Amino acid sequence: MPRKPRFYLPDVPVHVVQRGHSQEAVFYEEADYRAYLDWLEEAAERYDCAVHSYVLMTKHIHILATPSARDGVSRMMQYIGRRYVPYINDTHGSSGTLWEGRYKASLIQEE
């Protein structure tokens, strides 16, 4: 059965959560956080997503972003994942998936 397509709207904020596979760490040292943030900055600029805030925890991440285009958040997260996962696997001698499935995303409504 195919996955449900994600639903985003341009200029509507999105809360993104991505967790480590089997509740494992996704950041091991300071350089890992820096690498992730560098790619987040590149991706946000490339796909025109305004990143309002983020929290990088040892085992998961939170990002609050507003995309200008409908596919901005998806493209941003794909860009980061295609760089960060191989970086972790190469740097720390691991292999396979880093994340627990797809990231979760929720539209943020105004009151």
Regions found by a protein language model. Name each.
Residues 1-111:
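Short catalytic/metal-binding and nucleic-acid-binding patches
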